[in-house]
């Protein structure tokens, strides 16, 4: 090793800026982004039994229910628990959509969801960090 050799210069890779979230996005897009963020923080619970336990413990911050749930008793139970414990409730049209948002699917190499399993009920116990999508969801819930 001679003194003529220069130390290699390490250049950090460019950091990709997160995609800007438009202020005028619709509720379903905002809910999808909110659930994705909450899932990354481990704050999403799926299934009727686990959701009912969290609602009764008053840990649930938001409950998302599929409108096309094939068990009317599930819908009645979740709505009653939310009303009784004053938990915010949102509904989505499809259980398959909710299952995809909850992570009950396989993601192929192109980033598309496949083998999606339906999800009738989902509870968010931790939203993670505050985002624009979360504020849109909160505004919608407050206006109900």
Swiss-Prot record:
User: Which InterPro entries does the UniProt record give?
Assistant: Ribosomal_eL30-like_sf, Ribosomal_eL8/eL30/eS12/Gad45, Ribosomal_eS12, Ribosomal_eS12_CS
Cellular component terms, GO, for this chain's entry?
Answer: cytosolic ribosome; cytosolic small ribosomal subunit; nucleus
Q: Which domain of life is it from?
A: Eukaryota
Sample GO molecular function, one term: structural constituent of ribosome
Assigned keywords, A-Z: Acetylation, Ribonucleoprotein, Ribosomal protein
Please name the Pfam families in this protein's record. Answer: Ribosomal_L7Ae (PF01248)
| Entry-annotated residues carrying N-acetylserine | 2
GO BP terms in the entry: translation
- List each coiled-coil range: none
State the PANTHER family in the record.
40S RIBOSOMAL PROTEIN S12
- Family membership, please give it: Belongs to the eukaryotic ribosomal protein eS12 family.
Name recorded for this polypeptide: Small ribosomal subunit protein eS12z
Source species: Arabidopsis thaliana (Mouse-ear cress)
């Amino acid at each position: 090793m001679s003194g003529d050799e220069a130390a290699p210069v390490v250049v950090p890779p460019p950091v990709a800026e997160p995609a800007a979230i438009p202020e005028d996005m619709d509720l379903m897009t905002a809910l999808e982004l909110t659930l994705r963020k909450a899932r990354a923080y481990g704050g999403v619970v799926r299934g009727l039994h686990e959701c009912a336990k969290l609602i009764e413990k008053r840990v649930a911050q938001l409950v998302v229910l599929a409108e096309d749930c094939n068990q009317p008793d599930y819908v009645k139970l979740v709505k009653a628990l939310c009303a009784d414990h004053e938990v915010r409730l949102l509904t989505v049209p499809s259980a398959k959509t909710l299952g995809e948002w909850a992570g009950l699917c396989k993601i192929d190499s192109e980033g598309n969801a496949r083998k999606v399993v339906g999800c009738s009920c989902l509870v968010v116990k931790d939203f993670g960090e505050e985002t624009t999508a979360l504020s849109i969801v909160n505004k919608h819930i407050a206006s109900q």
